[in-house]
Swiss-Prot record:
Ranges of compositional bias, category Pro residues: 896-917
Family affiliation: Belongs to the Mical family.
Keyword Phosphoprotein tagged: yes
Low complexity compositional bias, start-end: 1254-1271, 1570-1579
Compositionally skewed regions (Basic and acidic residues) per UniProt: 1050-1059, 1522-1534, 1672-1682
Identification of the protein by name: [F-actin]-monooxygenase MICAL2
Subunit structure: Interacts with PLXNA4. Interacts with RAB1B. Interacts with MAPK1/ERK2. Interacts with RAB35, RAB8A, RAB10, RAB13 and RAB15 (in their GTP-bound forms); binding to RAB35 is of low affinity compared to other Rab proteins; at least in case of RAB8A may bind 2 molecules of RAB8A simultaneously through a high and a low affinity binding site, respectively. May interact with MAPK1/ERK2.
EC number: 1.14.13.225
Species of origin: Rattus norvegicus
Feature: compositional bias, Polar residues: 693-709, 1233-1243, 1277-1292, 1580-1591, 1698-1715, 1747-1756
Residues with the Phosphoserine modification: S631, S1677
Length: 1948
């Protein structure tokens, strides 16, 4: 009997094993039936089945499975299987979600029946699994059923395998599963309940199935999108036609197949090149593709219909997708070929054979289906009650929420819904009221579509049925019971169809956008806003707006700083309208619906267009209290938020509702009081304006004095005018009696409404040079002074009143003329005319003063010139001046601008002016401001003088309106068809369907790429000005071929030949070309450009101002809907800095740009040879993409705060090309070592004989910068004066302004700091040169070696421009790429003593140092040996360390303040003496270290990225191994007792500048700054024992650049001051270190969810970083945050174990070496970060700064240690770590993919919704316009209201589309960064000794590009965070407003 039992047990075990390993549905059921029969189990006994089965099958394999299932069943929610023991459930559908729901209900103890209409699991399609899904399935024993389940990094499984796993688990838990049974419908309980209580049943096929009598209480629909359960309405999410193709190929599991990489997904939105290549090679056009390797090779792709038609897959094109994809319309053979071709290309033809797998029908497993529409149920559950029987109806899986397949959300969200449904059943079974059950379920369902792997709880072990364990911040009561009453369906409700009840008891939510809006309400609102404005009387929505004044008044009422309303002329309709259109477009993102010309040409504007346009203002500003007239002045006082403009503009498309907080308008005041009070306020403030302007714009004291004199004249004039006004009888009467005196009674503020600083902006029209501008005027185009700049740019033209800047009110006085006017005017008006005569006389005096000053300036300039310059100047004055000037004009005006004389700066057309719309009038004003300080610039002195001469001898020009019109930008030319004609198809385009870009209007469908015909988006396109064509970003690079480049160059050369005698002088004198189009190289985007200056698409920035600064470049931000192109021109007063739009402008200007690119970027002698490479660079990626609202923040920054004459075009071009040119840093190190010393010598010495190319340079300008690229080799082209940079050195500055005040003023002037800190190498030569100025925001100017790059434009365009770098610090893409060599002359020359003493004597006297610094130019003579020593980057001396300590002490003393630039001229004597003493004290120890490099010249040059490499390598090693390695060679370093230990706080992750400045710092700078900090911080790892060769940088330099480039040795004692903001260091570490990948998700930008949700704010993340105890916490999540006090001694704790003594005492390496290593190892182990361990291990014993250099063999010994490190890497790096890193990288890639797919899908849905609303809008518009037969039969008011709602809906969709595009851009950057990181890691895994020059260059290039991407991402994240903060603030304001009205605010 015992034998029989044993045999039976063995047999049962075998059958159970067969059941577990069964691979088909039928086989599983068969094995299960055999098992139950064998063990005498009753499957229908669901309560006891599992326990009986477990007791009878007890093999070791089975026990492991029972353990898994028991652990799951032990959750308290199940109550040991008794929670729902009385509930019967029917589940329709045996898919993964249905089975998972059945398992949960079985655990609850319910009776569960599953019906499945099939008996096979044949779907090989692969599902992506979220981490929690994998964990959940493992908890169910998935690994026991399927051994390959998620092995390694696999995170997907085929549907078939998943179904089998869940199928078997459900059977074991007692779930009753019926196959081949189809559910038909639910049968209600019969009415006759007396005899027998019969509840809810179902009808099945076959009809006689036993289940037909099964009564159930709960029915759950899990039958996919068929959704056979009634009562659930579905919402359709319709995108573009999406045809999905799935293909399964046989997997033979061969070695070749195993090597093929899977494709987690390729999203079109950030990998377009892949799809373009696929289309070009195969003709297959896809939107995405995924490849998973499972039991088959599974491919799924989304194909475009046209591609399928072209390839013959679809035979005929039908609109109906069902007909389109029906079997009769599909060629199966072509479909197979299509799928195979796509799979081959996607896998790079690596799969040896692609034979199709066979599906359950015996056919090749290829399917094509429609994913155009996705559906989601409006509700997740409902309750039915009949005959006292309740039925709970629920949906799960695709029935509930249909997934978009590329996102991989189907299974994950399906499982979550299954848990939520089981929780609902449990609640209902326990007696919870039905409405509460439904309300809770709906609350959870609202969360479901938003779930992502990132925003659900990460502790998967705690997951239970309870939703609180899965959803963070859960609110189960967000839906109230009364809101789901319609879901409880009883007999009494039968008469109400379900559709009706869908709207019953809907909550009365208050939403700003949902409130009732009618056109008459819009009219009333407009009347309120324009009340009190002269000549503005709004009575309707058509004619009242024709003059443009009403539009300007609306803008002025909310943002008075944007428009100078006083200066507007009522009769100038075109200008007024265009001004309003341009300002609204630039500031608010409101695109124009017409043009100024069209408004002027029609008597009555189109009503619908005006309603649509005005509705956007209404939507933007409604609910905003009116601004009181008299309070406007105070809004722009010292505390004004000048930064609002930029952030407002950057985010205007994201959210057009950003009202400024204003106090209510006080209407009680009389008009007279208003006028007089405002006038008096203007007078009282006039005296304050110059000082404030000087402060806000960084103007010099000298200019403040000059402006004070000027303003005295203005002040007197205004006082007279004010006195006159006060004596008049009544302003209102004056308005009636004297209507033509337009300036008298306007309720517009003169100076009061203007931001301070514009007092220096006279509204002058004549071309005579006048007042010098503020010294740093062009630097004001930053956020801080953005408003000021805007006001400056928007002073409209007034040709009749040339010299009256502040007398806007009396402008019309001067326009009055003729006796007839006098006769008809009342006495007061005649008095006004008399007063105007006084004003004229005052003006004449003013003009004479200005002319005299300009002449004196010209004389001074002339006498400072050399012979050639004087000759050129004289020649230009006597007969030859016209030639070059005309040439300049012709070059700079690609469009048909009349070549006005050079002395008169042609006013740009306001319709297209890159500056604010009134730029045409701004030009003269700017011109006046730009003359005086031109003398301070050296770049183009000759041309300046020529212009000055011509200006002084030309009659004043009166710019008539026709002239202005001809000079206006042709943004909206009428010749293009006007607003009602599509630019492409030339057909009618109605208002609702009208899109606009580049001044053209078109249909959405017509907006296509000229090459590939892909539909473009208004937020992302490229435009060719010449051809008038639009391109996608991929094809824009090809729009100008190399032949056209050659053609341009040929034309340029021919033009130069024709000009005969002028080539040399012209090359030397020429300004920067106005428009640089270098088709690809010039493509950049102005991150740093101010939002207040958009570039207009058609306007040529080419007009050369006579007084313009030589290298001024206009950087303007494109309007929200457009791309940017590079326009490099002598901008207007430098206020528009580097307009960047992706355009190819005229051939002339492009050619000029190419020819001048060398001089633009720097004196590159190979500019001509390098130019052809520019357009041939690889296709653009992210930098080209322009997005609607955050264009400035998404892409490469543009330098705005360069020095007075620095070319602001340089950084933009440089970064633009850098991303395209992988070879941009070729030869950078070789060039540096070969050129930097000679270049520095030249920089420090005056030119002995200036070459012809530098003829225009001032004698004080060293020739090194004009021809420094290749010594002795110069070309005219490459050394034009534009390359000279004015650094305001004493030798070159005419205003006696020292650099320090300049920078201090500049610090005050700029509202935000520079975007990217500049890298400055630690080379001893460079470190000892004081050439790196750091502005208070930490901005550094470029180092000299970067200028010396000799590979032409390509080198000059290098983004980071770190032609030299040091092991210790790595280049971060810089903002100001080039070090002006005047600063070399000032700073580097000043440090000649430092250089020479470091290289030779090692000492210098303080007097000598001071003297040499004052000399400015002194030649440095070095021997070859000394040069070699200086250029050896490993050469460090004791002197450096002492100097660095000194610098650190200095830095520590001023820790809380902004870091002031320390110029040589301002370095205090005390500091010099202290430095001298330090050097003397260490002089004796310097020699051995200095000799070390020469003793080890044999090894190959080290990789510039070796520090990062070794840091990451160490992070791969276990901490113990790293500890052993380091401790094997203890370092002998001592800290002399007598030396201070200022280094303990030397390095800190902090912003530069005060808290105020810090708050304004751009996020981009932080990323790059912290990037530099990180790699310096990581540096100890790289040279484990080379510290004896390493010395910190020069103390003076250190004091400036410390926060940007911390020294290696400072790492061990890094501290985090409480005030510091640890911004983006953790982010960067996560991006660059391998360690982080295994420890948690990325922070920063990566957590932007596709739905616009953020899991955790970036600010909170930074706060956490601050609170971490030490640097190790940067690599770990802060689970235990220390008290605030722990923030300061961040690293000191970490270092204390290294040395038992205090930091100030002597550390004895002999006693602390090994112990310290062990202690640090222990500490690092606690931190859990091997990277931190390695960092501290290296720097631990070396924490004391000073080394013991007595051992001459230390260098070689340390080299041995490094060699050992490299050799042991391959041996010690565990495979598991590599696997883990690979897995984490793949997971991150998958996250990005799914986000991208979601964004892509949502974009398509938005596009469809837009199309639908446009169709409806056009229909309504036709009716309203009377174009249909039934037009007169409908109520116009009702139609207009309906149409208006459609307009608002379209506006919202456009904003949403913009936000999606921004998210796509962020993902693109993230993906690009990840790929760069992986590539960099692969490069660094190569042994150092095996690397050649190319490897080093590639590493450098990759790193530079990665830093740029990091910076862009960080900037974007910060911008989005700011936007969210604003939105929250606005929402709070709105809620307060609603609550104040006594309303209840409920959210639905």
């Amino acid at each position: 009997m015992g034998e029989n039992e044993d045999e039976k047990q063995a047999q049962a075990s075998q059958v159970f094993e067969n059941f577990v390993q069964a691979t088909t549905c039928k086989g599983t059921l068969q094995a299960f039936n055999i098992l139950t029969c064998l063990l005498d189990l009753d499957p229908l006994d669901h309560r006891n089945f599992y326990t009986q089965l477990k007791s009878k099958v007890n093999t070791w394999k089975a026990k492991a499975l029972w353990h898994k299932l028991d652990k799951r069943g032990s959750h308290k929610e199940y109550k040991r299987g008794k929670a729902c023991s009385n509930t019967k459930c029917l589940i329709v559908g045996g898919g993964p979600c249905g089975l998972r729901t059945a398992i949960e209900l079985a655990y609850l103890g319910a009776k569960v029946v599953v019906v499945e209409k099939r008996d096979t699991f044949s779907r090989n399609n692969v599902l992506h699994l979220w981490p929690f899904t994998i964990h959940d399935l493992r908890g169910l024993g998935a690994k026991k059923f399927y051994g390959k389940f998620c092995a390694g990094s696999i995170d997907h499984i085929s549907i078939r395998q998943l179904q089998l796993i869940l199928f078997k688990v459900a059977l074991m838990l007692g779930v009753e599963i019926h196959v081949n049974v189809e559910f038909v419908r639910v049968r209600e309980p019969p009415k006759d309940q007396e005899n027998r209580k019969i509840g809810w049943r179902a009808e099945f096929l076959p009809a006689d199935h036993a289940l037909s009598n099964f009564e159930f209480d709960v029915i759950i629909g899990a039958d996919g999108h068929r959704n056979t359960l009634e009562g659930f309405r579905r919402k359709e999410f319709r995108g573009k036609l999406a045809i999905a193709i799935t293909a399964n190929f046989i997997n033979r599991n061969s070695t070749a197949e195993a090597k093929v990489e899977e494709i987690s997904g390729v999203a079109f939105i950030f990998n377009q090149k892949f799809f373009q290549d696929l289309k070009e090679e195969t003709g297959i056009d896809l939107e995405n593709i995924v490849y998973y390797k499972d039991s088959t090779h599974y491919f799924v792709m989304t194909a475009k219909k046209q591609s399928l038609l072209d390839k013959g897959v679809i035979l005929n094109d039908y609109i109906d997708t069902e007909m389109l994809l029906c079997a009769e319309n599909v060629n199966q053979d072509n479909l197979l070929s299509y799928a195979r071709e796509a799979a081959d290309f996607a896998t790079n033809y690596q799969l040896p054979s692609l034979d199709f797998a066979i599906n359950h029908n015996g056919q090749p497993d290829v399917a094509m289906f429609d994913f155009t529409s996705m559906y989601a149920s409006e509700n997740a559950a409902l309750m039915r009650e009949r005959q006292a029987h309740q039925l709970l109806v629920a949906l799960v899986g695709d029935s509930l929420l249909e997934p978009f397949w590329p996102m991989g959300t189907g299974c994950a969200r399906g499982f979550l819904a299954a848990f939520d449904t089981a929780w609902m059943v449990k609640s209902w079974d326990q007696g919870t009221p039905p409405l509460e059950v439904l309300a809770e379920r709906e609350s959870l369902y609202r969360l479901l579509p938003q779930t992502t792997p990132e925003n659900i709880n990460k502790n998967f072990e705690q997951y239970t049925l309870d939703p609180a364990t899965r959803y963070p911040n859960l609110n189960v009561h967000c839906v109230r019971p009364h809101q789901v009453k319609h879901l409880y369906i009883t007999k009494e409700m039968d008469r109400f169809p379900l559709e009706r009840w869908g709207s019953v008891r809907r909550s009365a939510s208050l939403s700003r956008r949902e409130s009732d809006i009618r056109p008459n309400k819009l009219l009333t609102w407009c009347q309120q806003q324009t009340k009190g404005y002269q000549h503005v009387r709004v009575t309707d929505l058509t004619t009242s707006w024709r003059s443009g004044l009403a539009l300007c008044a609306i803008i002025h009422s909310f943002r008075p700083e944007l428009i100078n309303f006083d200066s507007l002329n009522e009769n100038d309709v075109v200008e007024n309208n265009q001004l309003a259109f341009d300002v609204a477009k630039r500031e608010f993102g409101i695109l124009p619906v017409t043009t100024g010309k069209e408004m002027a040409s029609t008597q009555e504007p189109d009503k619908l267009s005006m309603v649509m346009y005005l509705s956007k203002f209404y939507e933007l500003f409604r609910g905003t209290p009116l601004r009181p007239m008299d309070s406007r002045r105070k809004n722009y006082g010292e505390n004004a938020d000048f930064g609002l403009g930029k952030t407002f503009f950057q985010n205007n498309y994201l959210n057009l509702t950003l009202p400024r907080k204003r106090t209510p308008r006080v209407d009680a005041q009389t008009e007279e009081n208003d006028v007089n009070k405002r006038r008096r306020q203007g007078f009282n403030n006039l005296e304050e304006l110059p000082a404030f302007s000087s402060r806000s714009l960084g103007s010099s004291q000298e200019y403040a004095k000059e402006s004070g004199n000027q303003n005295k004249v203005k002040y007197m004039a205004n006082q007279l005018l004010a006195k006159f006004e006060e004596n008049t009888r009544n302003p209102s009467a004056l308005k009636q009696d004297c209507p033509r005196v337009s300036g008298m009674g306007k309720p517009v503020l003169c100076s009061a409404s203007r931001p301070p600083g514009t007092s220096h902006c006279p509204k002058l029209e004549e071309s005579t040079p006048r007042l010098p501008p503020p010294l740093k005027r062009q630097f004001s185009s930053t956020v801080a002074t953005g408003q000021v700049l805007r006001e400056l740019n928007q002073v409209p033209a007034s040709g009749e009143c040339p010299g009256r800047p502040w007398r806007a009110r009396a402008k019309s006085d001067l326009q009055l003329g003729g006796a007839e006017n006098l006769a008809t005017l009342p006495p007061t008006c005649q008095g006004a005319l008399a007063l105007s005569g006084v004003l004229r006389r005052l003006q004449q005096v003013e003009e004479k003063v200005l002319q005299k000053r300009a002449q004196n300036l010209a004389n001074r300039e002339f006498h400072t010139k050399n012979i050639k310059e004087k000759a050129a100047h004289l020649a230009s004055m006597f007969g030859h001046g016209d030639l070059p000037q005309d040439k300049l004009l012709s070059k700079r005006v690609p469009h048909a601008h009349p070549p006005s004389p050079p002395s008169c700066l042609p006013s740009p057309d306001p319709a297209a002016a890159p500056s604010p719309p009134a730029a045409d009038s701004v030009s003269p004003a700017r011109k006046v401001l730009t003359v005086g300080k031109v003398s301070s610039g050296i770049g183009a002195a000759a041309e300046v003088l020529v212009n000055l001469y011509l200006n002084d001898h030309r009659p004043k020009t009166q710019a008539t309106s026709p002239d202005l019109e001809s000079l206006r930008k042709a943004e909206f030319p009428l010749s293009l068809g006007g607003r009602d004609t599509c630019y492409f198809c030339k057909k009618r385009v109605y208002v609702m369907e009208r899109l606009s870009a580049e001044g053209h209007f078109f249909h959405r469908e017509c907006f296509r790429c000229s090459v590939c015909a892909a539909i473009l988006r208004v937020a992302a396109y490229a435009f060719d000005c010449d051809e008038g064509k639009f391109y996608c970003k991929l094809h824009f690079a090809h729009c100008k071929t190399s032949s056209k480049q050659r053609k341009r160059r040929a034309e340029l050369n021919q033009q130069r030949e024709e000009e005969g005698t002028w080539p040399e002088q012209e090359a030397a004198r020429r300004d920067v070309p106005a428009e640089s189009s270098c088709a690809v190289a010039a493509i950049s985007t102005p991150e740093g450009s101010p939002p207040d200056e958009p570039i207009s698409p058609k306007k040529s920035k080419s007009v050369p101002k006579p007084n313009s600064r030589p290298m001024e470049v206009e950087a303007t931000s494109p309007r929200p809907s457009e791309w940017t192109s590079v326009r490099i021109g002598p901008g207007q007063d430098g206020q528009d800095v580097l307009a960047v739009r992706v355009l190819v402008t005229s051939e002339d200007s492009s050619s000029d740009t190419e020819s001048d690119s060398g001089s633009i970027i720097g004196p590159c002698t190979e500019a001509c040879e390098e130019r052809p490479r520019l357009p041939e660079s690889p296709p653009l990626s992210q930098p080209l993409t322009r997005h609607i609202s955050l264009r400035e923040t998404l892409t490469q920054p543009v330098s705005l705060l360069l020095h007075h004459k620095e070319p602001q075009a340089v950084p933009g071009l440089q970064r633009a090309y850098s991303l395209q040119s992988p070879s941009k840093y070729q030869n950078w190190r070789r060039k540096f070592q070969s050129n930097s010393t000679p270049m520095n010598q030249r920089a420090l010495s005056p030119p002995k004989e200036p070459p012809p190319s530098s003829s225009s340079s001032s004698p004080s300008l060293p020739s090194s910068f004009s021809s420094a690229s290749v010594p002795g080799h110069t070309t005219d082209d490459s050394s034009s004066p534009q390359v000279t940079y004015n650094l305001h050195s004493p030798q070159i500055s005419r205003d006696d302004v020292s650099p320090t005040p300049i920078y201090l003023r500049r610090a005050r002037a700029q509202g935000i700091t520079k975007e990217i800190p500049l890298y400055l190498p630690h080379s001893p030569m460079l470190e000892s040169t004081e050439h790196c100025l750091v502005s208070p925001d930490g901005e550094e100017l470029r180092s000299p070696e970067e200028i010396s790059a000799s590979d032409g434009c390509q080198k000059a365009l290098a983004l980071g421009n770190s032609e030299s770098t040091h092991k210790d610090s790595y280049p971060v893409s810089g903002k100001d790429p080039y070090l002006p060599n005047q600063m070399l002359a000032l700073g580097a020359a000043g440090n000649t003593g430092d250089l020479s003493e470091e290289s030779r004597m090692g000492q210098t006297g303080g007097a000598e140092l001071s003297k040499e610094r004052k000399l400015g130019l002194k030649k440095l003579v070095l021997t070859e040996e000394q040069k070699t020593m200086l250029l050896d980057w490993n050469d460090y001396t004791q002197e450096h360390k002492a100097g660095e300590r000194l610098a650190q002490e200095k830095a520590e003393n001023g820790r809380g303040n902004s870091l002031k630039p320390i110029c040589s001229s301002t370095l205090s004597q005390a500091v010099k003496e202290k430095l001298l003493s330090q050097k003397k004290a260490l002089g004796e120890t310097r020699t051995p270290a200095a000799k070390a490099p020469r003793e080890r010249e044999v090894p190959p040059p080290k990789s510039p990225l070796r520090l990062i490499a070794n840091a990451i390598f160490r992070s791969l090693l276990p901490s113990s191994e790293a500890g052993k390695k380091t401790s094997s060679k203890p370092e002998t370093k001592t800290l002399p007792r007598g030396q201070p230990h200022a280094f303990t706080r030397s390095f800190s992750f902090r912003k530069l500048g005060s808290s105020k400045d810090g708050d304004q710092q751009s996020p981009g700078r932080h990323m790059a700054k912290k990037a530099s900090a990180f790699f310096s911080l990581a540096s100890p790892t790289s040279k484990a024992a080379q510290a004896s060769d390493l010395s910190p940088p020069n103390p003076i330099l250190r004091s400036r650049s410390l926060p940007n480039r911390p020294s290696k040795m400072f790492f061990a004692t890094t501290s985090l001051p409480p005030s510091s903001k640890v911004e983006d260091v953790p982010t960067l570490l996560e991006k660059v270190s391998l360690q982080d990948a295994a420890q948690g998700p990325k922070k920063g930008a990566s957590h932007i969810s596709p739905l616009g949700l953020k899991d955790k704010s970036f600010e909170s993340f930074l706060q956490e970083c601050k609170e971490r105890k030490d640097i190790g916490d940067f690599f770990n999540s802060p689970k235990e945050k220390g008290p605030p006090g722990n923030r300061v001694p961040s690293l000191e704790k970490l270092v204390q174990p290294v040395d038992s003594t205090s930091m100030g005492q002597v550390a004895h390496p002999s006693s602390t070496g090994q112990d310290a290593q062990a202690a640090v190892r222990t500490q690092a182990g606690k931190e859990g970060s091997s990277l931190v361990s390695s960092l501290v291990l290296v720097s631990g014993p070396g924490a004391p700064v000073t080394e013991d250099t007595s051992s001459p063999t230390s260098s070689s010994a340390e080299e041995d240690v490094e060699t050992q490190l490299s050799s042991r890497l391959k041996e010690k790096i565990p495979r598991r770590r590599r696997k883990l890193e690979k897995q984490m990288a793949k997971q991150e890639e998958l996250k990005r993919l799914h986000k991208a797919q979601a964004i892509q899908r949502q974009l398509e849905e938005v596009e469809e919704r837009q199309r639908t609303s446009e169709i409806q809008g056009v229909r309504l518009e036709k009716v309203l316009r009377g174009e249909t037969a039934d037009s007169g039969t409908q109520d116009e008011a009702q139609l207009l209201q309906e149409w208006f709602k459609l307009v608002l809906e379209k506006n919202k969709l456009m904003r949403y589309e913009s936000e999606l595009l921004i998210m796509a851009q962020e993902l693109e950057l993230e993906d690009h960064q990840s790929r760069l990181e992986q590539k960099l890691r692969q490069k660094m895994l190569k042994d150092e000794g095996q690397k050649d020059e190319n490897d080093l260059k590639e590493e450098q290039e990759i790193f530079e590009e990665m830093m740029q991407v990091i910076e862009q991402r960080n900037k974007l994240v910060d911008s989005l965070e700011e936007q969210r903060i604003k939105e929250r603030t606005q929402d709070q304001h709105f809620e307060n407003f609603v609550l104040s009205r006594g309303c209840q605010l409920s959210r639905t």
